[in-house]
Amino acid sequence: MMNSKPKYKLTDKDFNQINRRSLFGFQLGWNYERMQNTGYLFLILPQLRKIYGDNTPELQEMMKTHVQFFNTSNFFNTIITGIDLAIEENEGVEGKDTVTGLKVGLMGPFAAIGDSIFAALIPTIFGALAASMASQGNPVGVFIWIAAQIAICFFRWKQLRFAYDKGV
């Protein structure tokens, strides 16, 4: 019989690890069949091991759940991750269907919103500002571009903890 209620609570160190993995490794395992599935599992595997234990049937079951099709915006993936981990931490394997529904229900809308705003709109606006200023010999545009990118990274870093706290 599977252990239904995990006892591990995520720490700031866990959140920092997930954020680093999200920024630098989320797309590394991208493939045409299931897109970001391996990247998603890569983000949360250390925490899944802490929640379910190493080499347990629960861990294996949840790993199979997390390698299903997944594709969303790189800018919003940690919102889904935070909510997912909050559910798994509270419900364990019993929350498997909830986690699957969450991922399926949010990945499409977050892909559309995140990519439209953070991959198209913001780079276009700040890139145009930076290019216009640079063409006039003004280096301030470059710093505006850098500040915008830092703000985006800060947003990405903070949304994981926010989603986790509000997730259940």
Residue ranges and their predicted role:
Residues I18, I44, I51, I79-I83, ...:
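Weak global preference for isoleucine
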Residues M62, P109-I117, N138, V142:
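Hydrophobic, aromatic-rich alpha-helical transmembrane segments
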Residues M1-T98:
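Soluble N-terminal domains of membrane-associated systems
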Residues I83-E91, G105, T124-G127, K166-V168:
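Short alpha-helical linear motifs
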Residues T124-I125, L129-V168:
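Membrane-embedded alpha-helical modules
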Residues V67, V93, V99, V104, ...:
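Extended aliphatic helical segments
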Residues T98-S132:
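Transmembrane alpha-helical segments and their cytosolic interface motifs
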